Amino acid sequence: MEKIIVRGGRKLNGTVKVEGAKNAVLPVIAASLLASEEKSVICDVPTLSDVYTINEVLRHLGASVHFENNTVTVDASRTLSTEAPFEYVRKMRASVLVMGPLLARTGHSRVALPGGCAIGSRPIDQHLKGFEAMGAKIKVGNGFIEATVEGRLQGAKIYLDFPSVGATENLIMAAALAEGTTTLENAAKEPEIVDLANYINAMGGKIRGAGTGTIKIEGVKALHGAKHTIIPDRIEAGTFMVAAAITEGNVLVKGAVPEHLTSLIAKMEEMGVQILEEGDGLRIIGPSELKPIDLKTMPHPGFPTDMQSQMMALLMRANGTSMITETVFENRFMHAEEFRRMNGDIKIEGRSVIINGPVQLQGAEVAATDLRAGAALILAGLVADGHTRVTELKHLDRGYVNFHQKLAGLGADIERVNDEEAVHIENKEVVSDLNA
């Protein structure tokens, strides 16, 4: 088992480039199943484990998928299988995004119930409600969700009880080949939704209103392959913004799109962090003293839940009491216990956490409880006394490309090692401490 070892105390300086957005590329690759002719070419694709998983799902379904030099080429013109088995879906809940395109294109989809990060229940009832409104029959049993429709799906007016990103994406894809017009009300507004709509429109789709609460999809009879470049990853950008701030560093985050990061920029500036637009990115200058703040996670354009754990790491360094309220997912404070192992003064009260700072964090062995928590623990390690050892890196690899190498390029004392190497390093450090 591998772990990342961080030795705290270095200010980060330099330039880091953001990858293509993980949360945009997965639905875009899934949407390639809609193309009954021509190949799709998707550029700026990050080399993440989740990308390899969704590629395997498409191959299992009968599509030809080639991934090289950050470019995915998909040919889904042949006859497709309609079942996504548990061996793939258990690794990543985004695999459920093949339901919409399969149902629209073939009239049938059978997908195993999803896996991925263990963040609350994350139900997919909004997806299924939308499919039913468009004329599909749904059966759930034996660990699978099966959807069927006679002929084409029918355009419908669908109100989402919650602006679910996954449901919005799945229903856009299903509606793209439906007969008539579908209207999604209370739709998710994330930049990744806009990216998906732009891709489907390039394939010959007719989608209007993406990025607003009301999206209209006029169904077409067929879609073709298209070339598309994925937007930069706003969560990776935000993570490096926090890395610069927490270490009192000075870092240019290339590819960070200010319009995608409005709430994060506002909250970091409220803490006293200097953020400047520079070229095609943002320069982050961390202050010597951070101010405490309160924040609440919300659907976009509110504060993103995927930045909650990183901000918790930053707030442990703030001078005073801060509060974070999580409204998007339940059970997303598991990293708080790991921060406590590092001397964090954190108290959980229902869906909120109270953070008292500043504290001098202490290096410890901690486990990444989910993807973003893994990054947050590494950020905390950047300013902890001694060395911090972060395990369960499979979560981190689902969302970050060469995270430790990028931090090392900014001056962090960080390395990724296996168990044997870790023991050797720790023994050397014990001897060094004894001789000091």
Curated annotation (Swiss-Prot):
Residues binding phosphoenolpyruvate, per UniProt: 22-23
Catalytic activity entry: phosphoenolpyruvate + UDP-N-acetyl-alpha-D-glucosamine = UDP-N-acetyl-3-O-(1-carboxyvinyl)-alpha-D-glucosamine + phosphate
InterPro entries: Enolpyruvate_Tfrase_dom, Enolpyruvate_Tfrase_sf, MurA_subfamily, RNA3'P_cycl/enolpyr_Trfase_a/b, UDP_GlcNAc_COvinyl_MurA
Record-annotated active site: 117
Coarse class of the protein's main subcellular location: cytoplasm
Pathway the protein contributes to: Cell wall biogenesis; peptidoglycan biosynthesis
Record keywords: Cell cycle, Cell division, Cell shape, Cell wall biogenesis/degradation, Cytoplasm, Peptidoglycan synthesis, Pyruvate, Transferase
GO CC terms in record: cytoplasm
Record's subcellular location: Cytoplasm
Residues with PTM 2-(S-cysteinyl)pyruvic acid O-phosphothioketal: 117
MF term (GO), any: UDP-N-acetylglucosamine 1-carboxyvinyltransferase activity
Stretches of the chain forming a coiled coil according to its record: none
Record carries keyword Glycoprotein: no
One Pfam family hit: EPSP_synthase
UniProt binding sites for UDP-N-acetyl-alpha-D-glucosamine: 93, 122-126, 306, 328
Protein family per UniProt: Belongs to the EPSP synthase family. MurA subfamily.
Purpose: Cell wall formation. Adds enolpyruvyl to UDP-N-acetylglucosamine.
Annotated protein name in UniProt: UDP-N-acetylglucosamine 1-carboxyvinyltransferase 1
Lineage start: Bacteria, Bacillati, Bacillota, Bacilli, Bacillales
Gene field: murA1
